Amino acid sequence: MAPRPLNEIVEAGWAKALEPVAGQITSMGEFLRAEIAAGRTYLPAGANVLRAFQQPFDDVRVLIVGQDPYPTPGHAVGLSFSVAPEVRPLPGSLVNIFRELNTDLNLPQPANGDLTPWTRQGVLLLNRALTTAPRKPAAHRGKGWEEVTEQAIRALAARGKPMVSILWGRDARNLRPLLGDLPALESAHPSPMSADRGFFGSRPFSRANDLLMRLGGQPVDWRLP
């Protein structure tokens, strides 16, 4: 079966931005089909693998980079750190993100872990690797997704529009050179294993808004229902 054109599976602006890696996206699709053929599955569900690229490319004003999807079945939804509304309990990283959101902006605890409202505010929730194997963190790291997501970041940086990046953890911080002169906020990862080493108290949400306004952009409304 011939691969579907990019403009049928991602937003039009992203289709153009990702054109240099269209062949790599096709190769990753073949890799995932081979996994299924070999009796292995992957996360998130196929329809959500490229979900981050379904929001308008031109509207992105904050980039939050994750490592790879949650490995717990039922958790990964194609947006870094987000889960479906019905997921309980919340992943530890997300619990800590919400704790910092409250400390930073005095916002109440959200009703669930669905971060989709942030994407409507122009926040791109992007994992470096877009798939993983169930119960195996980082299983697909180094398999080829990095070429795709790094092109996405380079394309965002080349737009010449106000954007702030929030880089949590070493994997995300390694992407700093791709951002050129655009501002980036760096801290420890919100994982329970590292949040006490610089994530708590980093105030990424208010600082991102301050930087956006300094660049002439509009602040993000970080409230969640």
UniProtKB/Swiss-Prot annotation:
The active site is at residue 68. It comes from the Bacteria. The keyword Cytoplasm applies. Pfam families: UDG (PF03167). GO terms for cellular component: cytoplasm. PROSITE patterns: U_DNA_GLYCOSYLASE (PS00130). Its EC number is 3.2.2.27. It is an enzyme of class 3 (hydrolase). Belongs to the uracil-DNA glycosylase (UDG) superfamily. UNG family. Excises uracil residues from the DNA which can arise as a result of misincorporation of dUMP residues by DNA polymerase or due to deamination of cytosine. NCBIfam families: PRK05254.1-1 (NF003588), PRK05254.1-5 (NF003592). HAMAP family: UDG. This is Uracil-DNA glycosylase 1.
